[in-house]
Structures are given as C-alpha cells and as structure tokens.
Amino acid sequence: MRLHLLATLALAGCVSQPLPPEEAEHRAAAVHLKEAGSKTTAAEQRAALYLASAAESYDLLDSPKSREAARELYNKAATDLVLLLRSSDNGAMWNRPLTLTSGGTTWRLRYAAGNRNGTWDPGRFTSFTAASEVGLKTIDVHNRQDGIGGALVGVRKMNPKEPFAPPIAGITAPVTAVLDFKGRDATLTLVDPSEEPKARVKGSERTLDADFSAPLAYYPQRSEFWTGLMGALRVSHHMGTTGLYMLQPYDPDRIPLIFVHGLISTPQMWRNVINEVEKDPELRGRYQCWVFGYPTGNPPAYSALRFREELAKVRELYPNAKDYVLVGHSMGGLVSRMQATTIDREAWNVIGEDKAAKFFSKVKKGDLIDRATTFEANPKVARLVFICTPHRGSEMALGSIGELG
C-alpha cells in the first residue's frame, strides 16, 4: 500500500483536529474504508462501506486537490471489495445482484458480464489475491502500470483439475476491478488489462492499474536446480510432473507460445522470459504463454512423445486454436524439434538396414517404443525457436553426466 494512502487512513481517525482542505475533502472516503476493514462487522455491511468509500473517492477523481488520494482510496476499496465478496460465505455474495445497506444508505450492486472485448466473466475465477500481496523475489523486473482500479490476481483452481492447469496453483490472470456509479447503483467490472489497458470510469478513458508480474510470481517457487536435478536422477518420482500447462486462461485469439526447458531444469527457468513477453503490450496482445514440463532423466524421444500427446489434447479440446510457436532450450530444443519432424521406420535405415530391421522386428505397431520412434510432423507447429540446442549431439553425453542416464 502506498505511504500516501497509509497516511490518509491514519488521519481518518483523527477527528479532534482540523484537516487541511485537500485531506478534509476525501476524509469520508478514508473513514468508510477504514470501517470496512473491521473483521467484526458483518460482510454485507462491510461491502456497503467499501462501496461508500469507492463512491466518495469516485466523485473526487477529477478534483485538482484530491485526485491522487482519491484514486488510491478508490483502488483500495475496489480491491478489498472483490476479495470480500469472492471469499465470504463460500462466495455466496459473488456474481449475483446485491442490495447492501450500511448507516441508513442502501447500495445496489451488479456484476458486468464477461465478453471477448477485455472483460472477464466473474464466474471464471475461484479466488483472488491482491497483486500487491504477491511476493516478487524471483522476478527480475516488476512489470506493472499505475492507474485506476483494483489490481488483482485472478485464480481458477478446480477440483478435479482442469486440462492444462498447473497442478498446485491453478491458472492465473491479471485482473483490474473497476466500479462505476449512477447514484446508489454500482457496477463492478473485472477488466483484463492485457487486452484493455484503459477503461471508461466516470465518463473518461483512464489508464488501468495493473500488475502483469504478480500472476506469474503467484506460482509456488521451488529450488529450480534441485527440482531439475531430481527430475534427471529420480525419474520415477517425477513422472507426474510431465505435462503442458497454460499459465493464463485459454484465449482463441492469441498464438500459443510454448516454452520447453532443457536438461536438469524445470519450467521455472522461463519465468523472467515470460515476464518480459508480458511486459510488451504488442507481444502480450499477440501471444499466450504455455510451458511443457518433464523429468529430463527420460530419453528425449519419450519426452517428445508425451509432448505430442499433450498437443494432440489441445487440438481435440481447442480445434480452432492458432498454430503454435515452440521455444526450446538445450534438450528442450530436441524435444520441440521432434514435433515438426516426420520419422518412419525407413528413416532408421541410417543406422544400417540390418540393425533397423532387427530393432523393429521386436516392436509392435502402436506400442510405446513404436510411437516414440516413428511419428509425423505436427501441422499446427508454425515456428520453432532453438536456444543452445545440440542438434548434432553433445560430447557431454559421452562423459559421466551421460552415464547417469
């Protein structure tokens, strides 16, 4: 929370001394915001107090003396209102019209429906976290913009787990909560700042307050090196980590940009690369970032098979998805390359026809080894980006590290 807002809330309790005009102007909003934070007050009354604070701040958004403080109070009220409504009584107040009363004042609140033009469906998310509460220790550059609205991380975590959802945290997204008022009628809109960097608030287009790093930093961070090492050395304990994971809700209008890590690594290695993609408005408007994770102690051909199977599931679930761009580092480049390569049994004659014939004489059509060694290029792969990929093999495989496999 900004120091200016902390000072405003502190002064809200000081009724015995006169306030400067610029602070007196938004004192009522600060008082209501402070009262709304009381956990001993009923949730419905707290929600009404948050609306009162937001409405009073809303009226001052264009005030020359108070607009900065008013914006901070408005943003805080919008953030805390969403957190309260979504979490109270298992979401009983969420995504339905509400009539809320506090201090003799009655408010009517409605939720704006989601659409394809930058507004989230309120029912999409199972929980929210204030973006300001997410730790950013693993993020090199904090990617955010200052503006109007409550900056949140929207989380969708279902049970049973949905396809392509990260297993621990679920799918996350940047969300900005905006409240608009007509008298005592309020509309709560959840804006996707990735698509709409601005919103109309109080009749004017205003830049949204948004945090694009927090949804990425929300995912639990484990030791990348040790997790990657164990995935290389104790494969059987890490088979369940294999999968394709969407880090954002699926968007049919954006290109899947799929990152594939290398040897002794995990998808966490890409967090700051993805953060840089999200930093660029043009890139984040064009691409949606996914990751493929796998224990690197498995043969690359097997990991490539699992990757093919995951991409086949995407095509089945989202047949109209845009063609993919794959980014592979080291071994991940080999795994990615095999998605755009066709290999049949005849291709294996390069090792010698007799050897190939002997090998395939023991392989049944359609079994695991057959599917891992013969396959067709995926027509949905539009582009490949290789980073330090040993296309012609690596001398490392001949040494002690190679013997581990």
Task: Outline where the language-model segments fall.
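Short amphipathic alpha-helix adjacent to the substrate-entry channel of hydrolases
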Residues: R271-Y287
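Flexible, membrane-associating and regulatory peripheral segments of lipid-active enzymes
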Residues: C14-L257, T266-N272, Q288
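A generic local structural motif
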Residues: G243-Y245, E276-V277, K313, D370-A372
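Serine-dependent carboxylesterase/thioesterase catalytic core
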Residues: A52-A69, R86, N90, L257-L263, ...
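Sec-dependent signal peptide recognition
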Residues: M1-T8
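Amphipathic alpha-helical segments in well-structured domains
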Residues: W270, I274, A304-F307
